[in-house]
């Protein structure tokens, strides 16, 4: 931004990204204009919470005179709208930081990504990215903000903008701390100057704000702390509305947990399980790092998102935790190191995992919905929360070769139906169920009726190998070359003789060169000519791909190519070798078989050579007819 003139009224330019953001909001949120009021009320409530907290902890802050409240005034004839709070107010620096710049890094990029994917920027997203104030430009062309900070020595200030690239700030005579926002509604949005419309919106979005909201002299909201009331008194409708209020989610929660603990530490909580993963989790790496339920101390909000209440893998849980065992002037650092917080976190984590277990047993469909949305996040706890590791393992669900698509099996269920002579739990990882089922490495297991877990979630390759064993049975990838396939069912077709197989495998090795670790006879294949497997100490294919995606500098692991001596293609290659071992089609076919195996496991980086050789082989086949 740049200061253009040094007069009583200072004019500033928005940064380029701020202009783009305003354009996105105004032109992409037109289907939900009413959310401007929800955002203005939310900002006013935050200002009041900060003022209340500061009054208790900072003697230098001015004390708010009169009632801590939000007041809305309307004029239907002139389409005038104003909302005022007696909160903490803003200094000039805070006006510039809060209203003149993008509130959070990455916000513009996130919204542009949604726009490119033709996803609607609904009101559900606005409050989550610190841009709620700017939604006011959907309903007006010009906004005035009058404010005075509660900080000692502060002056009254007026901020104005039309959202077109600049804004102004000037000093005014304002006696009391707080903020007033006023504007004239556009003709197409004059409905928001009608009392019935405003009352409906407040009831819909802001009924549970901690402070009274007045329309002129009428209070519109019912202030109630649901977590302080017994669960038996709560109605599902008010629980749903409270969830929508604190989470900015338009959907109802999937389920909720009411907690009341008395003992070494005492606290009450109400926690919510969303139906869907918030959109930002898909677009922002590390988004859960600073998430968490709201923390209240003696009914006063201390932190809007307290990351210390839950481990990171559970921070998608929304809700409120209220305790009297912390002091009101608790700092961020004290919260982090407080033994009270550690105990609350420990108890909450145990209760939430117990909640998930109960859902899995009593409401499996609801659990399936939860697991589909948040399973990948919960799995991360296996590598970070060793105290609850056993509980997390029992929550794991997988598709398998014996389940339908979208159906799950637990490790306990898998182990219970293992054959008596099966010593290990087998899994196979890849990009998706269809690709996994098409992999030749499954043929032996399917032929023997051995169940294999299908791991298509990218995080699986990091967390599942760390389990090592379950119920004294090792978890083993089917790619590993040390699996015993001695009892494989032999193909009805007679395999080529060893004296022919040995020289053919030598030609395979010479043709593929350093790109392969070895070429060996396969005992696992039933109906495919070749397959690729990892060496005993090598990473499996999915792990290699994940490391590449993370741009980790890892040496490319060489695979072992297994050859099925009973397959017609291998038998035909043997015949061609006997006739003329210098026949170029032998090498072409070998390359094609190798790259075909790479293609099946998703590891073929370029298809150019593959297609070229395919055309060459088709040409040779058609010439021989």
UniProtKB/Swiss-Prot annotation:
Alphabetized InterPro entries for the sequence: HATPase_C_sf, HSP90_C, Hsp90_fam, Hsp90_N, Ribosomal_Su5_D2-typ_SF
Domain of life: Bacteria
Region (A) residue spans: 1-332
Alphabetical list of SUPFAM superfamilies matching this protein: ATPase domain of HSP90 chaperone/DNA topoisomerase II/histidine kinase, HSP90 C-terminal domain, Ribosomal protein S5 domain 2-like
Annotated SMART domains: HATPase_c (SM00387)
An MF annotation (GO) of this entry: ATP binding
Chain residue ranges for the region called B: 333-545
Region listing for C, in residue ranges: 546-625
Alphabetical UniProt keywords: ATP-binding, Chaperone, Cytoplasm, Nucleotide-binding, Stress response
Gene Ontology cellular component list: cytoplasm
Localization terms from the record: Cytoplasm
SUBUNIT field: Homodimer.
UniProt similarity note: Belongs to the heat shock protein 90 family.
Function: Molecular chaperone. Has ATPase activity.
Identification of the protein by name: Chaperone protein HtpG
Organism: Chlorobium luteolum (strain DSM 273 / BCRC 81028 / 2530)
Gene encoding the protein: htpG
